[in-house]
A protein has these predicted regions:
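Juxtamembrane intracellular "pre-TM" segments in multi-pass secondary transporters
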Residues: 15-23, 201-234
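Conserved MFS/SLC helix-loop-helix module at the cytosolic interface between two early adjacent transmembrane helices
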Residues: 76-114
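Helix-to-loop junctions at the C-terminal end of transmembrane segments
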Residues: 78-89, 278-291, 375
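Cytoplasmic helix-loop-helix junction between adjacent transmembrane helices
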Residues: 120-158
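Intracellular juxtamembrane helix-capping segments at the cytosolic ends
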Residues: 130-142, 332-345
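Helix-loop-helix hairpin linking two adjacent transmembrane segments in secondary transporters
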Residues: 153-200
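C-terminal transmembrane helical hairpin of 12-TM major facilitator-type secondary transporters
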Residues: 293-337
Length: 403
């Protein structure tokens, strides 16, 4: 098999699974994929509850842009690494990317300056995009009538990683320091590498004559071909945008004299997002039975409601209620939109997922960076105005879809 042009598939070798929908997959594999998705995506969120500590430990405001840089790296990984999932053997790709992520995390932990932390964080984001190799792999292995539920389970694992990463980072940073948290992430990434090497079936991509360059060029063609992909991406840009705005600023908000809370509290708030974990499989099952569009409309309205709560109920109780509603809505929308895009062209799922997720994370990075600038200029009031404006746009997009 030549590089970039796999030959015809003669059938799976022992231990191999053809990379196509409908093949049976055991629960152990589903849960391994869910765990790996959570453990890998966690690495782009460890920094959020620790921003206050990092800002004090490294001079200047530059370090407060670590979440933005990390998300930019993640978006870059989606564009240049995730498309390989349609071209090369997925198990090997996932294992190698997890292993490289281990070394990138060590670079962040050891970086002596804000500039080097930013550079190393960019690499962490790039390699953590392996989480988006895992999600379409699960979709490809799942039978058609279980795809929504399987994707929902894997996405629940991914969301657990997002939520628990903040909790773990907040507690560890509060007790030991932010560098120690990144050092702890190193063996966690190494354990993920071992889990994937042990549990994943080998697979072969569908036969194709497309080179890697052609694969990347095809992303634009897929974007133009499928209006449903564009609609899903636009809607989720708004959802993930406000999600990024909130979690980027939360630790800084809690450190204000009004609350006087440290990274441990910021991390514990992450547990409240468990509502999103519940939303993932529920939304997947509803999408399978009644169609995903109803779920997406409901989620857009709930997201706007959560930001009205943040703006009007400025207390710990208001933050609690808003987080539960927002995380439930964002995750329900995500699972439903992915249910739509994964049905468009099965042999191009990795590339379709690349387009969708790259645009979503570029929007997240832009909103995160904007939120940081707004915070330094106008404080929490400015941030809530930003969140409400983006949420209103998300609701307006539902009206355009219906029209």
């Amino acid at each position: 098999m030549t590089e970039g042009a796999p030959g015809p598939v003669q059938g799976p070798a022992p231990g191999e699974t053809p990379d196509r929908a409908g093949e049976p997959m055991g629960k152990a594999v589903v849960f391994a994929l869910a765990a790996a998705a959570g453990l890998t995506v966690a690495n782009i969120y460890y920094n959020q509850p620790m921003l206050g500590l990092m800002e004090r430990g490294l001079s200047g405001h530059a370090v407060t842009y670590v979440p933005t840089v990390t998300q930019l790296g993640y978006a870059a990984g989606l564009l240049v690494l995730v498309p390989l999932g349609d071209l090369v053997e997925r198990k090997r790709l996932i294992v190698l990317q997890c292993l490289a992520l281990t070394f990138a995390l060590a670079l962040v932990a050891a970086a002596p300056s804000a500039g080097l932390v930013l550079c190393a964080s960019l690499v962490v984001g790039l390699l953590a995009s392996v989480a988006q190799q895992i999600v379409p792999f699960a979709a490809n292995l799942a039978p058609d009538d279980r795809r929504g539920a399987v994707v929902g389970t894997v996405m629940a694992g991914l969301l657990c990683g997002i939520l628990l990463s903040r909790t773990l980072a907040g507690i560890v940073a509060g007790l030991l320091g932010w560098r120690e948290m990144f050092w702890l992430a190193v063996p966690l990434a190494l354990a993920t590498t071992g889990l994937m090497a042990l549990m994943l079936p080998r697979s072969r991509p569908r036969p194709t004559d497309m080179s890697y360059g052609g694969l990347l060029a095809s992303l634009w063609s897929l974007w133009r071909e499928f209006p449903a992909l564009r609609r899903a991406a636009y809607v989720q840009c708004c959802q993930f945008g406000v999600f990024s705005v909130f979690w980027t600023i939360l630790a800084l908000r809690l450190e204000e004299p009004r609350f006087g809370l440290g990274p441990e509290a910021a991390g514990l708030f992450g547990i409240l997002g468990a509502a999103g974990v519940l939303a993932a499989p529920i939304a997947g099952r509803i999408a399978d039975r009644r169609g995903p569009r109803r779920v997406i409309v409901m989620a857009s309205v709930l997201t706007l409601a959560s930001w009205l709560v943040f703006a009007l109920w400025q207390s710990i109780a208001g933050l609690v209620v808003g987080i539960v509603v927002m995380d439930f809505a964002v995750q329900a929308s995500q699972v439903s939109n992915q249910s739509i895009i994964y049905a468009l062209r099965p042999e191009a799922r990795s590339r379709i997922n690349t387009v969708y997720m790259a645009i979503m994370f570029l929007a997240g990075a832009a909103c995160s960076g904007t939120a940081t600038a707004v915070w330094h200029g106008w404080g929490w009031s400015g941030v809530t105005v930003l969140g409400i404006a983006i949420s209103v746009l998300g609701v307006a997009l539902q009206g355009l879809r219906r029209g």
